[in-house]
Swiss-Prot record:
The keyword Ligase applies. Pfam families: GatB_N, GatB_Yqey. It catalyses: L-glutamyl-tRNA(Gln) + L-glutamine + ATP + H2O = L-glutaminyl-tRNA(Gln) + L-glutamate + ADP + phosphate + H(+); L-aspartyl-tRNA(Asn) + L-glutamine + ATP + H2O = L-asparaginyl-tRNA(Asn) + L-glutamate + ADP + phosphate + 2 H(+). PANTHER family: GLUTAMYL-TRNA GLN AMIDOTRANSFERASE SUBUNIT B MITOCHONDRIAL AND PROKARYOTIC PET112-RELATED, GLUTAMYL-TRNA(GLN) AMIDOTRANSFERASE SUBUNIT B, MITOCHONDRIAL. GO terms for molecular function: asparaginyl-tRNA synthase (glutamine-hydrolyzing) activity; ATP binding; glutaminyl-tRNA synthase (glutamine-hydrolyzing) activity. Its EC number is 6.3.5.-. Heterotrimer of A, B and C subunits. It comes from Sulfurovum sp. (strain NBC37-1). Belongs to the GatB/GatE family. GatB subfamily. Keywords: ATP-binding, Ligase, Nucleotide-binding, Protein biosynthesis. Allows the formation of correctly charged Asn-tRNA(Asn) or Gln-tRNA(Gln) through the transamidation of misacylated Asp-tRNA(Asn) or Glu-tRNA(Gln) in organisms which lack either or both of asparaginyl-tRNA or glutaminyl-tRNA synthetases. The reaction takes place in the presence of glutamine and ATP through an activated phospho-Asp-tRNA(Asn) or phospho-Glu-tRNA(Gln). This is Aspartyl/glutamyl-tRNA(Asn/Gln) amidotransferase subunit B. It is an enzyme of class 6 (ligase). Gene3D superfamilies: 1.10.10.410, GatB domain, N-terminal subdomain (1.10.150.380).
Length: 477
């Protein structure tokens, strides 16, 4: 039996207005090489200046994960030769990162939590972009110098499920902190996976393989599963030393397999040394105060939702998994929606319709205010639950319409007047005398028949609670 050992390196693109070491804008939609300057192009004499906003965002992350935020950190040069790096080095942090020794807690299927250590989070500059067309290549340096925060975990994960849970928690955290849009498809949240296996009980780690630049949670799980199986088979076949090397591999989406990219470099291969153009980054009290201003994070929200709003722990996890979902839920509550009912209508009714239509919650045609009002109207018996579903369907197709107008137009206003409901009940009982006698003779299952007939005649608008109450009065009199 083998134990899987997983560590993750996540590159988060910080949502600053300008690049890490110059004042060029960070937008990529511009014409190629438009957002560049002598610093981006590594022209002689151009000197870097640290982006204060990027440092504060990294610090805010550090405080959020209970890490040590170093008041002095060092920038280093990482030497390598690629066309998308005109300086032939990357400015990063190796010797002393701005954030060290943090932690993140993931939720396991059994309801417990597991601590995942964070070795460090450091600032570094992104490279440009190579574009290959036919038999020639072009380089776009608009992206060069964009601020990245690389978050390095401890090798604390033991399965692909734990790795994905950690990634999702990390993704959620940086979005709540508003330090990155963390768009995986656009590359602003990308992951390198380090995988090894070892016989259970063995302390020494096996040979570590790195899988580069995976941009979806699903692909992370698939890549880990494939790589673990490859290493296990090599071990069992007695060819582990020959086939499993410390190397960098790529995840081939089309073939659903990892394939060798290059031998894994060690730190010495990159010839790291302190950047002579940058003084140590010194944190001021003003920067600390600004970094400590942060929103309520997912774990705190879960605790509050469970303890104060009385919703289930699982439901709280679902709602807080996305910042937009949590804010939507809270807006529903401010509109008078009961928390437990709001959970059902948000996670089942609305999300079900949005998923079917391929719409994200932030683009929902039904606002949180509107859905909150609708749920409140169910509670005060203005409309039945069944009728409210029709109203929601209508709102999905017709934005910004008044709920009361929709209820009136569709004839869905719930009838709670005793007299109106009794009139319907009396008519039904009069037309079904034989069944009334059977009910009174002991066939109590017929009660459901009378309820159904009443709801049918009222076209679903009669208050179900009132119908049950008044029917019992009539049948038992």
């Amino acid at each position: 039996m083998f134990e899987t050992v997983i560590g993750l390196e996540v590159h988060v693109q910080l949502n600053t207005k300008t690049k890490l070491f110059c004042s060029c804008p960070t937008s990529f939609a511009e014409h190629q090489n438009k957002n560049t300057c002598p610093t981006c192009l590594a022209l002689p004499g151009a000197l870097p200046v640290v982006n204060k906003e990027a440092a504060i965002k990294a610090m805010r992350f550090g405080y959020a994960v209970n890490a040590n935020v170093n008041h002095t950190s060092i920038f280093d040069r990482k030497s390598y030769f690629y066309p998308d790096s005109p300086s032939a080095y990357q400015i990063t942090q190796l010797s002393k990162a701005i954030v060290q020794k943090g932690e993140l807690f993931i939720d396991l299927e059994d309801g417990s939590q597991k601590r995942i250590g964070i070795t460090q989070a450091h600032l570094e500059a992104d490279a440009g972009k190579n574009m290959h067309e036919g038999n020639y290549s072009k380089v776009d340096l608009n992206r060069a110098g964009t601020p990245l925060m690389e978050i390095v975990s401890e090798p604390d994960m033991r399965s692909s499920d734990e790795a994905v849970a950690y990634l999702k928690k990390l993704h959620s955290t940086v979005r709540y902190l508003d330090i990155s849009d963390a768009n995986m498809q656009e590359g602003s949240f990308r992951c390198d996976v380090n995988v090894s296996i070892r016989p259970k009980g063995q302390e020494a780690f096996g040979t570590r393989v790195e899988i580069k630049n995976i941009n979806s949670f699903r692909f992370v799980a698939q890549a880990i599963a494939y790589e673990v199986q490859r290493q296990v088979e090599a071990y069992e076949d007695g060819v582990y030393a020959q086939e499993v090397h410390q190397e960098t591999r790529l995840w081939d989406v089309a073939k659903s397999e990892t394939r060798s990219m290059r031998g894994k470099e060690e730190a010495a291969d990159y010839r790291y040394f302190p950047d002579p153009d940058l003084r140590p980054l010194t944190v001021t009290q003003e920067m600390i105060d600004e970094a400590l201003v942060m929103p309520e994070l997912p774990d705190a929200k879960v605790k509050r939702y469970v303890e104060e709003l009385g919703i289930k722990h699982y439901d709280a996890l679902v709602i807080t998994s996305q910042k937009e979902l949590a804010y939507y839920f809270e807006e529903m509550i401010t509109q008078g929606a009961v928390a437990k009912t709001a959970v059902t209508w948000l996670t089942s009714e609305l999300l079900g319709r949005l998923n079917k239509a391929g719409i994200e919650i932030e683009n929902s045609p039904v606002s949180a205010k509107t859905l909150g009002e609708l749920v409140a109207k169910i509670a005060d018996d203005t409309v039945s639950g069944k009728g409210a579903k029709e109203v929601l369907d209508h709102m999905m197709e017709n934005e910004n319409r008044d709920i009361d107008v929709i209820i009136d137009e569709l004839g869905l206003a719930q009838v709670s007047d005793d007299g109106a409901i009794l009139a319907i009940i009396d008519e039904i009982l009069e037309n079904n005398q034989e069944k009334v006698e059977q009910y009174k003779g002991g066939k109590e299952k017929l009660f459901g028949f009378f309820v159904g007939q009443t709801m049918k005649v009222s076209k679903g608008t009669a208050n179900p609670g009132k119908v049950n109450e008044l029917l019992k009065q009539r049948l038992n009199s």
